[in-house]
Every structure is written in C-alpha cells, then in structure tokens.
C-alpha cells in the first residue's frame, strides 16, 4: 500500500505555514502555528490509538475486513483531496487530521492482511518488501506535486501556489486509490473469527491446503453479524484480549507498550521534521530534496533489513533500528544548517521503513 508520508512531511507543513502565519485576520505567529500543528498530530495519534483496537477486532471477522478497509481508503482519499480546497488553517488542520485518522485506520486493516498473504517464516521479508516498494512508489505523486508547486508558477504562469496544492492533494489521493485497486481485487481473507463468543481464530494455516479449504467452506456457510453485534463483539474481543495479555501473553503486552512509545517517536519525527527546518530558516526546497532522498534510502534500508531477517533474529534487528533512530534524535539536537538536515534525513531513511516493517511482521508472528 502506497505511503503518503512524503507529501505530509514536505509540502503540507509548508502550505500550512503559509495559511497560518502572518498578520492577516485569524493568522498567528510561526511558533504558535508549529505548536498547534503538533497538537493536531497528537489528537490524531490519540484518536487513532483509541479506534485502532476496535478496527483490529472488527478485522478479525470473516468477509468484513476487505469491505471496511475499502471504506476507510475511499473516505481517506476523499478527505485527502479536500485538503487542497481549504481556505483557513483551522479548517485545513481539521480535514488533515480526519485524513490521517482514516489513513491510519486503513493501515490497521492493511497490516492485518499480512497473516493472510504469506507464511510465518516469510513475514519479515514480505513486510519489508511492502514498505520498501511503498516508500519508492510514494516518490511518483510527490514529484508531480513538487513540480507543480515549484515550477508551475514560473513555467506556466497561471498555476498559483494554491492551485499547485490542489493538484498535489488530488494526485496524491488518486494515486493512493489507484495503487490500492490490486489489493481490492486480489485479497482474500483466510484468518477470521467465525464466532466472537468462542474466539475461534483460524490463523495457523501455514501451507496446509486442507485447513485453507475448510476455512473457505466455512466462509460460504456463515453469515456476517449485524453492525451492532459486530461492534459489541469487537469490544468483547478487546477486553478478552487485554485479559489474556495481562495473564498469559505478557510478551505481547510488553511489545505493545514498547511499540506505542517508539513508534510515536517515529511519527513525531516524520510529521514535524519540515516544521523544525522551517523554524530554523533552512531552505525549503533543499529540505524537500533531502526528504525525497530519505524515501529512496528507506526503500533500500527496508530491503536490506528484510534480507538480514533471514539470518538474524527479528528482535535483534528491532533493537538496532531503535538504537539508530535514538542516535538520529540526539544528532538532531545539534541541527543548525541544511547539510546537517541532510545527514539527519539519511539517518532517518536508514531505519524508518525497516523499523515499521519489522515491527509489523514481529507482532504478526507473536500473536
């Protein structure tokens, strides 16, 4: 699934600052704009964290996952396109937060598909390849958006900054939808909860064709629960899972706590890097170029760590990625020029996709 983060990192903060900062009616200072942006990201994170478990529980029901995944993608794409038409920074933040919430919700369903498309021994590799090609694919709409933003006013005259942002958001949303079409068409849910009362999760299919056939047969005979029953079952499953983690699967609980903490750090760096660079008065075009470079490095890094996962334990590689990210954070404290920003971008790229991919595959294996 296509990663939208490059546009979010680069052009969105720049456009947001142009709407928010100034002496006009309703406009504010640069520092306050950065603070409000960070608050909006925090709200998005909290809401996503609250609805994530519900989405995950619902995703376990048979024949439900693809339909709800498709809904979150369509709503997210629509909100993404609407971002370009906002006239005030407040409205922009509201729609942007909604876009991110539905994007994150779609990722819950997307990530849960990993156990349906591969076997346990290949999860690290498949997950890493998914992130690698996602980061590389994100360069396509970003380059189109960047060309419209930088070159449009000079080369074509009639393309204003506002129109270039409309083009950028539209291209991003359309690209997000188009590259998800193969998943809409080809994905088939194999693992599911057929009855939330007994929590019978059919997931240990590996290469057993007999189990696969039995699951497909059950899919033909069982009916989907109603909406209210589905939500009630989701909460029942969440509470049951929490109880199980607290009493039996403490390894899963420990990982979830750790993941929540370190992945929030990853998200903070991704979402605020351009804001920080702008506040330091760094050249905006240079920052964008380095972020494009980050995507390419992230693609290569994900592929390398995917290969390394065949030799080393996933936990060992996770420790390496977390330590690397921590070192990047320490280095960022000394940031004062564009070259330093480029070095930081390279460091982020080395570990960003790898940490996300390995976290996804590791969690899929331990559950």
Locations of regions flagged by a protein language model:
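Glycine-rich segments within core transmembrane alpha-helices of 12-TM secondary carriers
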Residues: 127-149
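Helix-to-loop junctions at the C-terminal end of transmembrane segments
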Residues: 50-63, 300-313
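Juxtamembrane intracellular "pre-TM" segments in multi-pass secondary transporters
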Residues: 189-256
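Helix-loop boundary and gating motifs at the non-cytosolic
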Residues: 3-45, 251-258, 262-283, 287-290
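Helix-loop junctions at membrane interfaces in 12-TM secondary transporters
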Residues: 84-96, 333-344
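C-terminal membrane-cytosol helix-exit motif in multi-pass small-molecule transporters
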Residues: 145-153, 173-194
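Intracellular juxtamembrane helix-capping segments at the cytosolic ends
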Residues: 105-119, 354-367
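Structural signature of the two symmetry-related core transmembrane helices
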Residues: 67-82, 316-331
